[in-house]
Amino acid sequence: MAATVNLELDPIFLKALGFLHSKSKDSAEKLKALLDESLARGIDSSYRPSQKDVEPPKISSTKNISIKQEPKISSSLPSGNNNGKVLTTEKVKKEAEKRPADKMKSDITEGVDIPKKPRLEKPETQSSPITVQSSKDLPMADLSSFEETSADDFAMEMGLACVVCRQMMVASGNQLVECQECHNLYHRDCHKPQVTDKEANDPRLVWYCARCTRQMKRMAQKTQKPPQKPAPAVVSVTPAVKDPLVKKPETKLKQETTFLAFKRTEVKTSTVISGNSSSASISSSVTSGLTGWAAFAAKTSSAGPSTAKLSSTTQNNTGKPATSSANQKPVGLTGLATSSKGGIGSKIGSNNSTTPTVPLKPPPPLTLGKTGLSRSVSCDNVSKVGLPSPSSLVPGSSSQLSGNGNSGTPGPSGSTASKTTSESSSSPSASLKGPTSQESQLNAMKRLQMVKKKAAQKKLKK
């Protein structure tokens, strides 16, 4: 039996040697195929008893070992000419035996249930080893394919292989290209349509696979469709569009009214004052004027040029603005004190003026230290402040107060002061009430009016 095995194995061993020493990549696969062929052919006769013996109890395993040892001994016995070959073939044979023997043992231990049936049925004993051998051959192929598929699956799971061909091989013109949407890898040749060089090599371009581009187009179409669907309902939408148009002017009007408060409404009310000189109409127009800080700002801003307003009144009557302004500047607390002591100055002014009744109004406390506090009392009371104001400068103030209403002060200042009082007091005032915030605002507006008149006169002179 050993001799027959040797005769059959010699050419196969030679082939195996050639495959062992060859440097080609396919040599390992060919060696494997050769081993499978040799097992499928006549060598299986040497393995058949071993398989039969391995299936029964342990005693048969000793027989199996002895049978395996026989071919080794017989292969080492041939003549000296073949000694070198035999030694090398022995190594190959050992390696070839180790692999299938180990796999056979593992297969047989796993598939013990399968060979139990042939033991019971004697006629099938011959065919049973064949089935076992076929099962032995199959696991070899299955294992190799399992290893390959597991590697491929691993590569696929890691996203390293092409989705179409399931390979990681990369050629110069066939690189792996990644889709930016689904992050699948495609070979340039595997993808349909094929990926161009520009798409593959240009890092600025974002590449999408054909499937993702289709999906994105569908999504874009879906997003474009919704505005087209409610087209028949445009009729119902139009009134909603009209409503804001109707509402807009209302809101604008509201904004205008609110903004006018900050645009100083006294500008408009001053026109009312110029038209109607009666204090009743003025008080009604002032009610919509400024209050709080804005009113205070109006007072302070208009308080400064109040002396210039006096000079403007004198310009209307006489062409001497400089003297009156010079005399009116130093009016301070002394002028206020003289005006508040009694109605003497006011009475003197009233003798010269057309109005017999002049109300006595103390100034608001905020403008005490300013130069225009004589004006801030009211335009009607200029007579009482205008007359005692020269008393701070001129020594003949006692004669002015004790006089019978004529200008007792020497120089042009007294005459100008009397003129200012007569001009300013000509406007009748029906308000005999105490000073209120509205009246102070009235005074501020009158001052503004005077400033405007003066500016217009200056422009005309120029």
Swiss-Prot record:
| Principal subcellular localisation of the protein | nucleus
SMART domains with a match to the protein in the record = PHD
Q: Where is the composition biased (Basic residues)?
A: 449-462
**Its domain of life?**
Eukaryota
| Amino acid composition bias (Low complexity), ranges on this chain | 347-358, 382-437
Q: Name one GO biological process term.
A: RNA polymerase II transcription initiation surveillance
Q: Where are the zinc fingers (PHD-type)?
A: 159-215
Which terms in the GO cellular component ontology are assigned? Answer: INTAC complex; integrator complex; nucleus
The UniProt family comment states: Belongs to the Integrator subunit 12 family.
**Which protein, by its recorded name, is this?**
Integrator complex subunit 12
Please give the organism.
Pongo abelii
